[in-house]
Amino acid sequence: MATNITWHPNLTYDERKELRKQDGCTVWLTGLSASGKSTIACALEQLLLQKNLSAYRLDGDNIRFGLNKDLGFSEKDRNENIRRISEVSKLFADSCAVSITSFISPYRVDRDRARDLHKEAGLKFIEIFVDVPLEVAEQRDPKGLYKKAREGVIKEFTGISAPYEAPKAPELHLRTDQKTVEECAAIIYEYLVNEKIIRKHL
C-alpha cells in the first residue's frame, strides 16, 4: 500500500443511518452458474426499491465488463474478483444501502474474507446459498456454458472442472428448484425485516 495517502473522514455510519432511516448490509448470493442468483438479485432489488428502500445490485457478469474486465477465471483471478467486490459491496453497505451481490464465489475462504471485511467495519453480511442440483443447473444452462464445459471448450468451469465449496452455515439456504424467484426474494426481504436491518414497508 502507498504511504503518501490519507484517509479522509466524512459522515459517520450512524449519522447516515439516521438521515436515511435505513441500515446498510451486504446480501451475498452464492451458488452454481444457472442456480438463479442474478434473477433473485434483480427481483430483490426491485422489491426493495418499490418499497422506497435503498438497494443496489452488483452482478458477476456485469462487473467483468468494467471494474474486473482485466481478470480471467484462474483461481488467482477469481480470488481477486471477489476481493474487489467485497470492498465495493462494503462501500455500498456503509452508505446504508442494501448491497446485493450475485457471484458464483466458489471458494469458501474468499466468502469468509468478505464476511470478515464487513465485520471489521461493523457492517452486516448475509450469506445466501442459492442451491440447485447440478443436473438442474445443466438443464437450465441459459448461456450454454455447461455444454461448452462438458465439451472441453471452457476450462476451469465451476461445478464441472473446477470446485464449488458450498457454504457451511449460510444465513439463508434457498433451493431454487423448489421455490419461485418471487418466493426467494420475499424470504430474503422478511429476513432483513426480522433482523431489523430494514423496516417493513407495506
UniProtKB/Swiss-Prot annotation:
Functional pathway: Sulfur metabolism; hydrogen sulfide biosynthesis; sulfite from sulfate: step 2/3
Keywords: Amino-acid biosynthesis, ATP-binding, Cysteine biosynthesis, Kinase, Methionine biosynthesis, Nucleotide-binding, Phosphoprotein, Transferase
InterPro entries: APS_kinase, P-loop_NTPase
Record bears the keyword Nucleotide-binding: yes
GO molecular function: adenylylsulfate kinase activity; ATP binding
Secretion signal, residue range per the UniProt entry: none
Entry's Gene Ontology BP terms: cysteine biosynthetic process; hydrogen sulfide biosynthetic process; methionine biosynthetic process; sulfate assimilation
Entry keyword annotation includes Nucleotide-binding: yes
Residue intervals passing through the bilayer: none
Catalytic activity: adenosine 5'-phosphosulfate + ATP = 3'-phosphoadenylyl sulfate + ADP + H(+)
Database matches in HAMAP family: Adenylyl_sulf_kinase
PANTHER family assigned to the protein according to its UniProt record, in alphabetical order: BIFUNCTIONAL 3'-PHOSPHOADENOSINE 5'-PHOSPHOSULFATE SYNTHASE (PTHR11055), PAPS SYNTHETASE, ISOFORM D (PTHR11055:SF1)
Job of this protein: Catalyzes the synthesis of activated sulfate.
Name recorded for this polypeptide: Adenylyl-sulfate kinase
Originating organism: Saccharomyces pastorianus
